Amino acid sequence: AERLCGGGAGLAGTGSARATWLVDMPAGDAVRLSCAMMQQSDLGSHHLHFAPKRVTIGVGCARNCPPEELTELVRTALNEAGVCDAAVHSINTISLKADEPAILELAQHLNVPLRLFSAKELEAEASRLATPSDVVFAEVGCHGVSEGAALAQLGSEGKLWLQKRKTANATVALGLTDRPLTDLRGAARGRLSVVGIGPGQ
């Protein structure tokens, strides 16, 4: 409301230098705007937090991995990196896991898109992996699922930020890019629609 009434805003936070779309905003003390990927607390009623979506999450898991195991692993990784949920752009994995309940629940939990990549697309990232695995290659056709998926969503401008972390049944890796991500690479999960059923349909 203060801003709509003509009050100026002050920028702060580690991402403020990249927030070039805000340079024309009138400066002032009516509103404080923090631009950072880290969680902000005790902001007050005149303090807004904007988290640029610069982080991609790559995940992999065993078939029928307990959803809570994957979610807890991802939460631990985000806390380790100091990233708030709002800075997450997407969940990414191999196409073989399109129907994996733990991954579907994770995307719903974080309220971000789930994107799928073929083994060939993930193998294209092999040279950038921190922990390539011949065992994984023998099983699914690429040398890394979580790291490869995080990188595949970023494209060539991004980098691996947090290399693979794992539990007994799940893996996670984080990717990072300098600029907020606005597009989605990879494929969305397919849907089946029944158009008609019965005699004459």
Residues covered by each model-derived region:
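Hydrophobic/aromatic beta-strand patches that form the interior of the parallel beta-sheet core
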Residues: 92, 115, 193-195
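N-terminal glycine-rich phosphate/adenylate-binding segment common to multiple enzyme folds
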Residues: 1-24, 130-186
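Residue-level preference for the first positions of well-ordered beta-strands
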Residues: 56, 159, 191-194
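Predominant activation on well-ordered alpha-helical scaffold segments within soluble catalytic domains
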Residues: 71, 75, 104, 145-149
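Glycine-rich, flexible N-terminal cofactor/catalytic loop recognition
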Residues: 78-83, 188-201
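Conserved mixed alpha/beta catalytic, RNA-binding, or beta-rich assembly cores of soluble enzyme
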Residues: 1-97, 175, 181
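Long, charge-dense
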Residues: 94, 101-145
